[in-house]
Curated annotation (Swiss-Prot):
<keyword id="KW-0325">Glycoprotein</keyword>
<comment type="function">
    <text>E3 proteins seem to be dispensable for virus growth in tissue culture cells. They are potentially important for virus growth under special conditions; E3 region may help adenoviruses to evade the immune surveillance of the host.</text>
</comment>
<comment type="similarity">
    <text>Belongs to the adenoviridae E3_20 family.</text>
</comment>
<feature type="glycosylation site" description="N-linked (GlcNAc...) asparagine; by host">
    <location>
        <position position="75"/>
    </location>
</feature>
<feature type="glycosylation site" description="N-linked (GlcNAc...) asparagine; by host">
    <location>
        <position position="57"/>
    </location>
</feature>
<dbReference type="Pfam" id="PF02439">
    <property type="entry name" value="Adeno_E3_CR2"/>
</dbReference>
<feature type="glycosylation site" description="N-linked (GlcNAc...) asparagine; by host">
    <location>
        <position position="29"/>
    </location>
</feature>
<dbReference type="Pfam" id="PF02440">
    <property type="entry name" value="Adeno_E3_CR1"/>
</dbReference>
<keyword id="KW-0244">Early protein</keyword>
<feature type="glycosylation site" description="N-linked (GlcNAc...) asparagine; by host">
    <location>
        <position position="123"/>
    </location>
</feature>
<dbReference type="InterPro" id="IPR003471">
    <property type="entry name" value="Adeno_E3_CR1"/>
</dbReference>
<feature type="glycosylation site" description="N-linked (GlcNAc...) asparagine; by host">
    <location>
        <position position="70"/>
    </location>
</feature>
<protein>
    <recommendedName>
        <fullName>Early E3 20.1 kDa glycoprotein</fullName>
    </recommendedName>
</protein>
<dbReference type="InterPro" id="IPR003470">
    <property type="entry name" value="Adeno_E3_CR2"/>
</dbReference>
């Protein structure tokens, strides 16, 4: 067991040298091909809770199928991200993978895109103005309230300009008119 651990630690040093980067879509299965075998390939996931985990003996948190050479990742999720290392005990050959999980791309059919573009062009080229029957009552009420508010503000400004000047005895001949 000590020789296996020493082999794994020595191999960790060379992980970045010969790694293959694999992008797997979320929810799919993927097979990692191991090195040529003389006995059996042992698969480990580097960087887990224990520095390395022998994953063919486990069922959680990742589900895999191991045969003598290959490792199949089942129903891939985000926890499958990481370095996978397969080595043959007898021949000291190894394969390592950097697994990255990607989100599936949502594709819109081209016919839908064309229909959406045509609809947008129709709306853009022929703007419709609502006739008097289609104008909602709330819109009329809002417009009336805004007009009334503006009128009140103007009246208040005129009253202030006229009466404030009279009370301060600074009458301006242009503002001096009787209401």
């Amino acid at each position: 067991m000590a020789s296996v651990t020493a082999l794994i630690i020595a191999s960790i040093v060379t992980v970045a040298h010969g790694q293959t980067i694999v992008h797997i879509t979320l929810g799919h299965n993927h097979t990692l091909v191991g090195p040529p075998i003389t006995s059996e390939v042992i698969w480990t996931k580097l960087g887990s809770v224990d520095y390395f985990d022998i994953i063919c003996n486990k069922t959680k948190p990742i589900f895999v199928i191991c045969n003598r050479q290959n490792l199949t990742l089942i129903n891939v999720s985000k926890i499958y991200n990481g370095y996978y290392y397969g080595y043959d005990r007898s021949s000291s050959q190894y394969k390592n993978y950097l697994v990255r999980i990607t989100q599936p791309k949502l594709t819109v059919p081209t016919m839908t895109i064309i229909k959406m573009a045509n609809k947008a062009l129709e709306n853009f080229t022929s703007p419709t103005t609502p006739n008097e029957k289609n104008i909602p009552n709330s819109m009329i009420a809002i417009i009336a309230a805004v007009a009334l508010g503006m009128a009140l503000i103007i009246i208040c400004m005129l009253l202030y300009a006229c009466y404030y000047k009279k009370f301060q005895h600074k009458q301006d001949p242009l503002l001096n008119f009787n209401i």
